Amino acid sequence: MAMTAEVKDELSRLVVTHVSCRKAEVSSLLRFAGGLHIVGGRVVVEAEVDLGSTARRLRREIFDLFTYSADVHVLSAGGLRKSSRYIVRVAKEGEALARQTGLLDLRGRPVRGLPAQVVGGSVADAEAAWRGAFLAHGSLTEPGRSSALEVSCPGPEAALALVGAARRLGISAKAREVRGTDRVVIRDGEAIGALLTRMGAQDTRLVWEERRMRREVRATANRLANFDDANLRRSARAAVAAAARVERALDILGDEVPDHLAAAGHLRVEHRQASLEELGQLADPPMTKDAVAGRIRRLLSMADRKAKETGIPDTESAVTADLLDDA
């Protein structure tokens, strides 16, 4: 089951006892999943959701809290619909339900944001508002670089109201318009986890956090492996380049090279992958790595100086692109 469906399934089974919270959830769910329609001169309230368990929960709460009966209609998958959709409809008492849930104000005008009783309610009501909004049009992506919890909103006013509800819960959310749709988005992993718990999806949070931790460990391991590989490649290329320059230096100087410099040069050529410290230990008598580096540096400098005086290619000419590609 995808993460979004897991969250919605858990929220649909959540038992809520406080009446104000139950009403806030219903109001939010109807606001974010529904619409008001005029059919035969009467107001009809509709809400379209993607899980049968959500539709059953909404129908039950509408009856328990407001004593109104709701019908549930199933739109089967097919055509552009990848999965079944469920429409909860209240026709006979639609206007009364719309007024009691805050979809209509006292003058009978549609409320664009969240109802005043939800916006000004308790922190628990803010949690319920988020629960209803997520059940209506929420989504949660798998943990990763672009993980996000977001809710599609019916308009900018509803989006801003949801951002305000998140702020009351100590969670930072952002409202933005994406391809003509207003959305509220949370990207921070800690904030996503906190909101899942606040809404009542603690079990799904644990699963999400486990996947998140596993992905972070895997990403860290990959970064370290790539770092080590890059360092090894750089070290190998540097060793090949150094040996090639030393070989060229010995060719340029011939018999003119001092014995102590020649000895250091031959060590470098014969032990291409050895570190300077290891070369020093191989020397007879042993030397420090600084002494080895100094002798090789003087050998190259002497050879480059002679190459310049005689007009022949210097030691750098031995380091070709093909040579480094083969390293």
Curated annotation (Swiss-Prot):
**The UniProt record lists the keyword Cell division:** yes
Give the span(s) annotated as Disordered: 306-327
- Its Gene Ontology biological processes? cell division; regulation of sporulation
An example molecular function term from Gene Ontology annotations: DNA binding
Pfam families xrefs: HTH_WhiA (PF02650), LAGLIDADG_WhiA (PF14527), WhiA_N (PF10298)
Indicate the residues that the entry says bind DNA.
275-308
The answer to whether UniProt assigns keyword Cell cycle to this entry is yes
Q: Which UniProt keywords apply?
A: Cell cycle, Cell division, DNA-binding
Q: Which HAMAP family did the record assign?
A: HTH_type_WhiA (MF_01420)
Q: Which NCBIfam families match?
A: DNA_bind_WhiA
Give the protein's function.
Involved in cell division and chromosome segregation.
Sequence similarity = Belongs to the WhiA family.
Protein name per the record: Probable cell division protein WhiA
